[in-house]
UniProtKB/Swiss-Prot annotation:
GO cellular component term of the entry, any: cytoplasm
Pfam families per record: Mur_ligase_C, Mur_ligase_M, MurD-like_N
Gene name of the encoded protein: murD
Annotated protein name in UniProt: UDP-N-acetylmuramoylalanine--D-glutamate ligase
Similarity section: Belongs to the MurCDEF family.
Organism: Legionella pneumophila (strain Paris)
Protein's UniProt keywords contain Magnesium: no
UniProt-listed Enzyme Commission number(s): 6.3.2.9
InterPro entries listed in its UniProt record: Mur-like_cat_sf (IPR036565), Mur_ligase_C (IPR004101), Mur_ligase_C_dom_sf (IPR036615), Mur_ligase_cen (IPR013221), MurD (IPR005762)
Chemical reaction(s) catalysed: UDP-N-acetyl-alpha-D-muramoyl-L-alanine + D-glutamate + ATP = UDP-N-acetyl-alpha-D-muramoyl-L-alanyl-D-glutamate + ADP + phosphate + H(+)
Class of this enzyme: ligase
Subcellular location per the Swiss-Prot or TrEMBL entry: Cytoplasm
Pathway membership, UniProt: Cell wall biogenesis; peptidoglycan biosynthesis
Any one GO molecular function term: ATP binding
Main localization category: cytoplasm
Amino acid sequence: MNHSLYLVAGLGKTGLSIARYLKRNNKSFVVFDTRKEAPGLAEFQNEFPDVPIYLQQTPDEVISQVTDVITSPGLALDTPVLERARQAGASIYGDIECLAREISAPVIAITGTNGKSTVTTLVGEMAKAAGFRVAVAGNIGTPVLDMLDDEHHYDLWVLELSSFQLDLTYSLSPVVATILNVTPDHLDRHHTMEAYTQAKQRIYRGAKAVLFNREDVYTVPHQSCQTDIKCISFGKDAPSMGNWGLIEQENTTYLAKGMERLLPVESILIKGVHNWMNALAACALAEAAGISMQHILNVLKTFPGLPHRCQWVREVDGVGWINDSKGTNIGATISAINGIGGSMQGKIVLIAGGQGKGADFQELAQPVSEFVRSIVLIGEDADKIESALAKVVPVVRASSLEGAVTIAKTCAKPGDVVLLSPACASLDMFRDFNHRGDVFTSSVRGL
């Protein structure tokens, strides 16, 4: 007889998928959410009318019976209900851990502060081109447990994993794992760079091969590579044998593996040095998982990039407009400024601002001084950004993103690019970064 009682912590998309997974496996469960009006509550009650739901508080007599807590990654590990369950002896883990315990197909695991979604999508496309039945999931698209129904159809999983998901995962043994880069983000949750890096490093546990960024010390495996683990690196410099990088020859830059030139960067559609790094990482991961170089390079030549990630909108009166609304932290915005600024003659007019998540905006000073003409600020933390950068370049304030577009048009000169890369989260003014990007794109199309 099964006496286990599961607590699903957190509703929303992930919580719903966990509940469906438990129901398919005939497990008894209850649900908790910290919010009085939890997202997806009506949908949940419609689908699971007999399952008890506790909002904001869970009684001690329930906690004392719980054997396992499967929590959504959005719930901080020090949430009181999780602390009480831990003290009562319950195991606490997330949906990725459930997946790891269920599947036998190989996994490519991808994390990093920036570029995760681009690399994950690219690797998925490479696998599809090579004929793999591939599941692309995790911190992108469909929750993993909603895809488990079809597990026998997949011969490869490509997972984008956030630091929050990795905090809750113990058994994943990827065929290859990578940390693309680590820059300050989510410090409101992890508190220190050390804790944030430690969460990212969990992706390497049990991996058969690891791919790291040789220009970012935080991505280098903390456990030195053992003899049975293959270590591969990528970077902007010329690579050593078996590694990935860029080679300059006769005024042309090539993606390369060792001394082998694979493709001139002009042949790929995703632009900017940061996207060349994403392309190299995707190549390395795909090859490590057994995908042929022919399929890898064919996809690279046709992949258009993802919406809201350094996405070209249009040119107006000689000025280019680029939507990088996914630039929700300083590292992403630095990558965008350096990547775009380093490949053009003019200057950048930067639109930035929103919720800064405790970041230090002084880190923007160097790339801003080199490539940016002026900054138009919006949002909650505009004061903090202005105090960090007002001595570097002219700073103007706008009360809305539509207003910022109008101001940026007057600041830019022919040959310039207006770049929306906020270095901040969007929730002070928008539903999410997609909404912010859509508002920007719509405003630019209306110029």
